[in-house]
Amino acid sequence: MEKKKYSKRYCRYTEAKLEYIDYKDVEMLKHSLSERYKIMPRRLTGNTKRWQERVEVAIKRARHMALIPYIVDRKKVVENPFKI
């Protein structure tokens, strides 16, 4: 079997020179979530370790504040979960 090679990805937060990630900005957080609202790993998003940790904390805060659901039903999985 051949190993999958991932293309080189760059951290969008480092390039944007952000100071912090706001948990209320769901549009920015959706780039780090899968269609089932799971947090995507660094190798897929291209985030640095520092920003990945900050994204995880922001997503967990947004979930706690009910801005993002914890789980999604299989039947309700859509192409873009933020346009329901």
Swiss-Prot record:
What are the protein's GO molecular function terms? small ribosomal subunit rRNA binding; structural constituent of ribosome
Record's protein name: Small ribosomal subunit protein bS18
Starting at the broadest rank, the lineage of the source organism is: Bacteria, Pseudomonadati, Campylobacterota, Epsilonproteobacteria, Campylobacterales
**One GO BP:** translation
- On whether Ribonucleoprotein is a keyword of this UniProt record, the answer is yes
Instruction: Give the family this protein belongs to, as stated in its UniProt record.
Output: Belongs to the bacterial ribosomal protein bS18 family.
In the UniProt record, the signal sequence range is none
| Classification via PANTHER family | 30S RIBOSOMAL PROTEIN S18 (PTHR13479), SMALL RIBOSOMAL SUBUNIT PROTEIN BS18M (PTHR13479:SF40)
Read off the InterPro entries from this record: Ribosomal_bS18 (IPR001648), Ribosomal_bS18_CS (IPR018275), Ribosomal_bS18_sf (IPR036870)
**Keywords recorded for this protein, A-Z:** Ribonucleoprotein, Ribosomal protein, RNA-binding, rRNA-binding
HAMAP family per record = Ribosomal_bS18 (MF_00270)
Q: How does it assemble?
A: Part of the 30S ribosomal subunit. Forms a tight heterodimer with protein bS6.
Q: Give the originating organism.
A: Helicobacter hepaticus (strain ATCC 51449 / 3B1)
Query: Its GO CC terms?
Result: cytosolic small ribosomal subunit
